[in-house]
A protein has these predicted regions:
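Active-site proximal loop and beta-alpha junction motif in alpha/beta enzyme cores
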Residues: 2-98, 104-309
Length: 309
């Protein structure tokens, strides 16, 4: 992780005293870092959340996200459309309309810093996202309702296998790989076994002529074994737990009768990058179509700090 500016307690006061007068006029912004989809710190997917980001410009938010170097960083602002708060989500390079683990992690931080509510509506660029918070004996469980699933184009299994580096016979032929969105686009690729999942490598991508039809990430889902496990690999990195993608997977599982409507499914992700995660999903069925996708998990504190600008 790149340089961070942490100032806290006596050490922070001493550091401030040593700064030039111009620097002492800068403002500190507190953040809370949490791990999402786990009950254990240093597992799951990390998120830095700024619970009071008023006064930060767009450029500063982007620069902070780049400095912290997480997959996403969130900034909480006053609500503008009737929700509980406006939430802006930044990757290291751009603002995102929606992301799963940042939504859950931000709701957790809000529950810690603004206690008293068991449900929240977060205003994100994709629209309002409803979140519930449940204080359980073993930790805080947070669950969001994602946008209604949209099912897109189906992909040719041989094309996928050739492009992504495994045999076509390793795709679960009972189900067609398909684009699904519950706020973000993902191509769901059903695999027969965890052994295929384990040998996937970074750097594979679809041919250029296929990328327009299948935008977004490729989410590998083991459908041929009782325990569902997943991976999301990019060109240079792997995501340890992907709330937006697992919502699409939930819709896919119910739509294809792999799991029953409203069955809560525990899905594993992240063990191949030493960040084991458990994502809990469920989806309903109405008029022959998957609906009411919910994604949840536990969230835990990791650390707190102050960013000075």
């Amino acid at each position: 992780m790149k340089r961070r500016h942490f100032l806290a307690g006596a050490a922070g006061a001493a550091a401030m005293a040593a700064l030039p007068a111009t620097a002492q006029t800068s403002r500190g912004f507190d953040f809370i870092q949490v791990d999402v989809f786990t009950q254990n710190p240093l597992e799951g997917n990390p998120l830095a959340c700024f619970p009071d980001a008023g006064g930060l410009s767009d450029a500063q938010m982007q620069a902070i996200a780049r400095e912290l170097n997480h997959s996403e960083t969130t900034f909480v602002l006053p609500a503008t459309a009737g929700g509980d708060a406006k939430v802006r989500i930044f990757s290291t390079t751009a603002e995102l309309p929606f992301a799963g683990h940042p939504t859950l992690g931000t709701a957790y931080v809000m529950a810690k810093t603004r206690p008293g509510k068991n449900s929240l509506v977060l205003e994100e660029k994709v629209g309002p996202i409803s979140v519930t918070l449940e204080h359980r004996p073993d930790g805080m469980f947070v669950e969001m309702t994602q946008n209604e699933p949209l099912f897109g184009a189906k992909a040719d299994p041989k094309m996928l296998a050739d492009a992504l580096g495994f045999g076509v016979d390793e795709i679960d032929s009972r189900y067609a790989p398909q684009m699904v969105s519950t706020g973000s686009n993902f191509l769901i690729v059903p695999l027969k076994s965890v052994s295929t999942l384990a040998k996937l490598t970074l750097g594979h991508q679809l041919p250029p002529e296929q990328r327009a039809a299948f935008p977004g990430g490729i989410y590998y889902v083991v459908t041929g074994e009782p325990q569902i496990e997943t991976r999301l690999l990019g060109a240079t990195s792997e995501d340890p737990a992907t709330g937006s993608a697992v919502g699409c997977a939930a819709a896919f599982l119910v739509q294809n009768s792999i799991r029953k409507p409203d069955e809560r499914i525990a899905i594993r992700q992240g063990r191949f990058v030493n960040r084991p995660s458990i994502l809990y999903v469920r989806a309903g069925m109405a008029n022959g179509k998957a609906t009411n996708v919910r994604v949840g998990g536990y969230v835990v504190d990791a650390m707190r700090g102050r960013f000075t600008i």
